[in-house]
Amino acid sequence: MAGLFKDIWHAMTSYDRHAGIDSPYRTGRHVPLNRNSGLAGVTTASDSRADINSPYLQGDGRGSTMSFDTAYGGRAISPMPSPANGGPYSPGLVSQRQSVHQDAFDVHSPTGEIPMQNFQNGGPPPPPVASSWEKIDRWAEENYPELFDQLGEGCTVNDLNELEYQLDCTLPQDLRQSLQIHDGQERGGLPTGIIFSSMLLDCEEMVQEWENWKTVNQEFMLDPVLVKRQSQAFAAQASSSKDAPNRNQNWRQELLNKQDSVPPAAIQKAYAHPAWIPLVRDWGGNNLAVDLAPGPKGHWGQIILFGRDYDTKYVVARSWAHFLAMVAEDLSSGRWFVDEDTNELKLREFKATRVEPSYFEILRWRMDQKYGRTANKRKSMAPSMASASGMRSPPTPGSPYQSPTEHNEPRGRSLHRLTGTSPMSSPIRPGYGKPSPLARVAEEAPPTTSLTASNASLEAKAADNLMELNTPRTSGEHSKEDIKVNEDSPAKERTSEDKEKKPETEANGKATESKGKQTTVEDAEDMKDIEI
């Protein structure tokens, strides 16, 4: 009961969004980072403390006044050693350092001028995170107020410390600043996000996504020997079950062989890694994450694109500050639009309006264009000459734009694809324009005698056997009426031969009519012998 009251009191009196009363950072029972070597970052806590490089101390044992404007909220820090160069202290160094940082410039040379800064990969340093968020907030408030209302408030320093404790890593300073401005998005239920329909995660969702990928690593990507040992505990329960069908035992190695990165060697060759902290997610199992364990040619804190649809990982930005600046620039470019049906925010990267790729695909395409990576030619699904003769064609390397399938074993999304060869040819594949094999099938020959001609001859023969007779009457007072034989409607559809005989038939009909008028039927029983 006392613990519940403490939690309620802490929620009412603090601005913490995720940290609780039992946080190790609050009670002094903090367990140091890298307690789990497999989940620790490659750096130390010095990367998240702006005052750690200050070599000067105040008289009371505290650091300079800069320590009050750090991620630790002005908490007293431990005494720091003397300058690294070993030089003696001279009067005025502390005041000179404070006056330098009171100006608008962060870095000054000893002469008082702004030094030249090294470009990173040919580009200048990114703008501050606060400046990028100011542009994004201004755009969202003017163009999409509903989306602007979903942006969360900034988290506190205690929340960030608790997040680092749960993830067992040290987050970059620009990411900590970004979370203090906007702690992700509220879960409003709309299928849209501030990162062009992709959801910006808060601290709690970051931990959830990280745990999901951690579970994938533990249950699927571990050594099969370890998995077998873990499954021995449930052998008694599974003894009565049927044996599972034989599966490919080398699928883990085949999956790892497919993993690649752009640029090469910038990301570790892995399907998922515990040092990849998800920051943005789409609705298909893909994430933008900060990489805390980069490859040999990568940079700590780079933003990468990984997920179930990306065996090839992409470095989309050098840091989180670079990525926010890129998003702000895309929003200010005027190429955005909102889908009227789904209310999704999208970016029109291409001129063709019928092409509407997701923002993740646009980032992938930009990286391919930047590093000159093109897609391999897709295989034709039409049967080739080698397959027709029973010989297998040599395998070609898989394309990054194709689905990660091999040997008819689909992985990932359940797409409807043809499992066998198809006689249909696509315009973008070789063999387009060739006649289809169905066009070479011999059809049944039509009969030599026309059906219409045979019907017309039968109708003409039946018309010749008809004759016009008067109706017999019992009384002679009434005038005799003529009986006219109606011609059949199908007789109108006669061939050219019947049309030539038409005058003769009409003449014979008139003669028969005149003769019938003169003939008198004396006995009514004679009508029975007449063939009509």
Swiss-Prot record:
Pfam families for the chain: SMI1_KNR4
Secreted: present as a keyword of the record?
no
Q: Where is this region: Disordered?
A: 374-532
GO MF annotations, alphabetized: protein-macromolecule adaptor activity
Q: Which GO terms describe its biological process?
A: cell wall organization; fungal-type cell wall beta-glucan biosynthetic process
**InterPro entries documented for this protein:** Knr4/Smi1, Knr4/Smi1-like_dom, Knr4/Smi1-like_sf, KNR4/SMI1_regulator
- Ranges of Basic and acidic residues composition bias in the record: 475-516
Biased composition of type Polar residues is found at 447-457
Superkingdom assignment: Eukaryota
Comp. bias regions, Low complexity:
381-393
From the record, give the cysteines joined by S-S bonds: none
Q: Name one GO cellular component term.
A: cell division site
**Which family, according to UniProt?**
Belongs to the KNR4/SMI1 family.
As for what it does, the entry says: Involved in the regulation of 1,3-beta-glucan synthase activity and cell-wall formation.
- The identity of this protein, by name, is Glucan synthesis regulatory protein
Name its species.
Answer: Neurospora crassa (strain ATCC 24698 / 74-OR23-1A / CBS 708.71 / DSM 1257 / FGSC 987)
**Gene symbol of the encoding locus:** cot-2
